[in-house]
């Protein structure tokens, strides 16, 4: 009997340990699998997709490049198909230029991306849009290559 109890305790411990490795946040397996396929990663804020500036915008611009709009529309529709109807869109910039200008630019870029999601069926109240300007760089702004990485818009499934 004691042998069976020990075996049961060992199995229960392993299951508990492994379940921590398979954290999906609050999502089901299919939702998490789709997000991973799209390039999302699980972060402290939620499932996050980083959209680099060079793919979406021209330098110092907040209008989406026409070639990128269909990909954002498809992403929006796919999120809705998987009942992922609440998102946060966050704009970021590098540290070149006036901080208040960068803050405004990050807000405009996030708003532009949000508008595409609204046009493809997201309800306005289910999208939180914000700019963080220069406040959260991915890497130090010590080179042009690093500054490019810091100019981005993140889509977050909270």
PLM regions with names:
Residues 19, 77, 114-115:
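Core alpha-helical elements of the protein kinase catalytic domain
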Residues 92-158:
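Periplasmic OmpA-like peptidoglycan-binding domain that tethers envelope proteins to the cell wall
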């Amino acid at each position: 009997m004691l042998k069976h109890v020990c075996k049961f305790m060992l199995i229960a411990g392993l299951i508990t340990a492994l379940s921590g490795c398979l954290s999906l946040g609050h999502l089901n397996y299919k939702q998490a699998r789709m997000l991973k396929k799209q390039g999302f990663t699980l972060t402290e804020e939620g499932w996050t997709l980083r959209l680099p500036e060079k793919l979406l915008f021209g330098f110092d611009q907040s209008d989406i490049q026409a070639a990128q709009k269909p990909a954002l529309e498809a992403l929006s529709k796919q999120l809705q198909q998987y009942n992922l109807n609440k998102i946060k869109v966050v704009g970021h910039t590098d540290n070149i230029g006036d901080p208040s200008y960068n803050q405004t630019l990050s807000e405009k870029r996030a708003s532009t991306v949000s508008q595409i999601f609204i046009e493809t069926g997201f309800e306005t109240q289910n999208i939180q849009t914000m700019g963080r300007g220069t406040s959260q760089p991915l890497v130090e702004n010590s080179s042009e290559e690093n500054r490019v990485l810091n100019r981005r818009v993140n889509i977050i499934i909270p």
